[in-house]
Amino acid sequence: MAEVVLQNVTKRFSDHVALDDVSMTVPDGSFVVLLGPTGAGKTTTLRMISGLDQPDGGEIFIGGMPMRGLTPAQRNVAMVFQQYSLYPHLTVRENLEFPLKSPLLSTPRAEIDRKVKAIAEVLQIAHKLENKATALSGGEMQRVSIGRALVRSPQIYLMDEPLSSLDAKLRADLRIELKSIQAGSGATLLYVTHDQIEAMTMATHVGVLQQGRLVQFGSPREVYENPVSIYAAARLGLPRINILPADIFAGAPPRARNIGLRPEHIRQGSGEESLVTRVEHLGDQTRLHLSFRNHQIVTVTDAHTALRSGDIVKIEPNKPLYFDAEGMRLA
Ligand SMILES: Nc1ncnc2c1ncn2[C@@H]1O[C@H](COP(=O)(O)OP(=O)(O)OP(=O)(O)O)[C@@H](O)[C@H]1O
């Protein structure tokens, strides 16, 4: 496995700048998740690293080697797309074996069998090994595509929302499996997702992309607790961070335009009165929807709370984040 370095990478599509001077180091053995809304440049970043597309400016290094001019095969990267890409006329087993049968690798038969079996078990498709790829459900095909990447030992795995087409239970299972495969093998993984839970649970680092610019890079915890802007703060956390006018509570510093309060950073029982508008019991926690001076706030409370819609609850900020008129964090 290898470190991947992007140095001032820029990519334009006619006059649209999809990646704008992006510099980023994906450390060897890390699990980096790229975050950003649609169009932020996540897929473009993966395509540049894979060699499917060329940057207009800047350099990409994998394992210290410059990648300019090298084909995807020469880069030895494994990519999993959101949409499965299988050989339809081959069986699941043949699809999984395919990458190992490359003449360059000359993997021994016993080794191929062992790897295919192990991966098929992890991905819960062992019972479908002899089926034709076309005889699978969408979720099964996607698992085979993931398997085709995992049987290899590339320099880096590039995955673009690989779990988004799977049902919730399988997604939760595979999240744990992928993370343990990565942690166990020391693989380097660059991963795109819109799923907050995937990002928080799997990433060693997250990179926040905003209109083609990398605006923050750090551990999920760092980005969660110390976001550089409202934009970065809104990328992690569910329910989302509450953004309110800064003067809605006393104590805002000069130049503060907005206060950001994570749902769990609102103390209840003292402070200002707010109205409970909805109580959502989710089992392990309860969400309170509050109306406070014409603003809606979401906070969390005790799972067995007796609060009901129409009640009054006192609230005050705990660990507030302040942002200026441009949405940038104030120290
Ligand atoms: N082949 C292309 N031709 C023209 N424009 C493109 C092309 N590929 C991407 N773009 C543009 O570049 C920008 C970044 O696209 P990209 O696919 O990287 O976004 P993304 O963050 O992956 O979004 P999504 O979450 O929707 O996949 C977008 O504005 C997109 O329209």
Regions inferred by a protein language model and the residue ranges of each:
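The feature captures the beta-strand-to-loop junction immediately N-terminal to the Walker
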Residues: L35-P37
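Helix-to-loop junction immediately C-terminal to a conserved catalytic motif
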Residues: S50
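Conserved coupling/switch loops of ABC nucleotide-binding domains, chiefly the family-specific signature
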Residues: D56-E59, Q211, P320
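Conserved ABC transporter NBD signature motif
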Residues: G58-P66
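ABC ATPase nucleotide-binding domains
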Residues: P72-A78, Q82-V228
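Non-catalytic connector elements of ABC transporters
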Residues: G251-A331
